[in-house]
């Protein structure tokens, strides 16, 4: 139906529209200083060295476009929800495959992208994950979940552009708020491949996360 086939190039949607309210800073956390430059530029510079990525779309407020001056990127405007921002970025995508990455995650590794893309070519969608190191309890009713059956989801995620578009449209029609991008494939009853991370994954949500990101370099 979707003609899942191999194509060597992907677009990258780099999400940079978040407000960063939980971080408590006076500016969105993706623009906080990290090794002498805004945090998001660390991810962008890593992405520019990844051969599978042929174009990058930054989803950000117009007031922050100047941060990306001199970089070969396109721009799209953020929406109210994550899925609205992703849909906005998709309007600029020129490739049949797309990677989606959070701007508050400073690391995007070439070997993991290669494995993600290879897996997505087989199924239509793939996400980076890691094992759950803790005991997890469901709240209502209270019970202990089997952590060996669970995974922590990270970005980037790779998905066929057509699948992501149709899944987002389905979510909007059914008033479903997506919590990650490969959930769009799940809504269409399509498989999602899980690719386990080879490197530590950091999402900068709180100040201590930024300290940890520095320590990983």
From Swiss-Prot:
EC identifiers of the protein: 2.7.7.60
Coiled-coil regions listed: none
Catalysed reaction, written as an equation: 2-C-methyl-D-erythritol 4-phosphate + CTP + H(+) = 4-CDP-2-C-methyl-D-erythritol + diphosphate
Keywords from the named record: Isoprene biosynthesis, Nucleotidyltransferase, Transferase
Transferase as UniProt keyword: yes
InterPro entries from the UniProt entry: IspD, IspD/TarI, IspD/TarI_cytidylyltransf_bact, ISPD_synthase_CS, Nucleotide-diphossugar_trans
Matches recorded under Pfam families: IspD
Site entry: Positions MEP for the nucleophilic attack: 147, 203
Disulfide pairings: none
Alphabetical GO biological process terms: isopentenyl diphosphate biosynthetic process, methylerythritol 4-phosphate pathway
Residues the UniProt record annotates as site (Transition state stabilizer): 22, 29
PROSITE patterns noted in UniProt: ISPD
CDD domains noted in UniProt: CDP-ME_synthetase
Keyword hit for Zinc-finger: no
Enzyme class: transferase
GO molecular function, one term: 2-C-methyl-D-erythritol 4-phosphate cytidylyltransferase activity
Pathway: Isoprenoid biosynthesis; isopentenyl diphosphate biosynthesis via DXP pathway; isopentenyl diphosphate from 1-deoxy-D-xylulose 5-phosphate: step 2/6
Free-text function comment from the UniProt entry: Catalyzes the formation of 4-diphosphocytidyl-2-C-methyl-D-erythritol from CTP and 2-C-methyl-D-erythritol 4-phosphate (MEP).
Family listed: Belongs to the IspD/TarI cytidylyltransferase family. IspD subfamily.
Annotated protein name in UniProt: 2-C-methyl-D-erythritol 4-phosphate cytidylyltransferase
Organism, scientific name: Chlamydia abortus (strain DSM 27085 / S26/3)
């Amino acid at each position: 139906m979707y003609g899942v086939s191999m194509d060597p190039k992907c677009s990258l949607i780099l999400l940079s529209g978040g407000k960063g309210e939980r971080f408590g800073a006076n500016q969105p956390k993706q623009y906080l200083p990290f090794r002498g430059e805004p945090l998001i530029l660390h991810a962008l510079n890593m992405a520019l060295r990844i051969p599978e990525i042929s174009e990058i779309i930054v989803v950000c407020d117009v007031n922050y476009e100047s941060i990306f001056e001199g970089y070969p990127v396109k721009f799209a405007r953020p929406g109210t929800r994550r899925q609205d921002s992703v849909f906005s970025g998709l309007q600029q995508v020129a490739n049949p495959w797309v990677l989606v990455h959070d701007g508050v995650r400073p690391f995007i590794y070439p070997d993991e992208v290669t494995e993600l893309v290879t897996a997505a070519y087989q199924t239509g969608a793939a996400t980076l994950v890691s094992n759950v190191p803790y005991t997890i309890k469901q709240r209502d009713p209270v019970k202990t979940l089997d952590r060996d059956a669970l995974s922590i989801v990270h970005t980037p995620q790779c998905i066929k552009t057509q699948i992501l578009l149709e899944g987002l449209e389905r979510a909007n029609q059914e008033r479903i708020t997506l919590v990650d991008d490969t959930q769009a494939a799940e809504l269409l009853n399509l498989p999602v491949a899980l690719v386990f991370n080879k490197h530590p994954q950091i999402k900068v949500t709180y100040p201590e996360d930024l300290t940890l990101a520095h320590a990983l370099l």
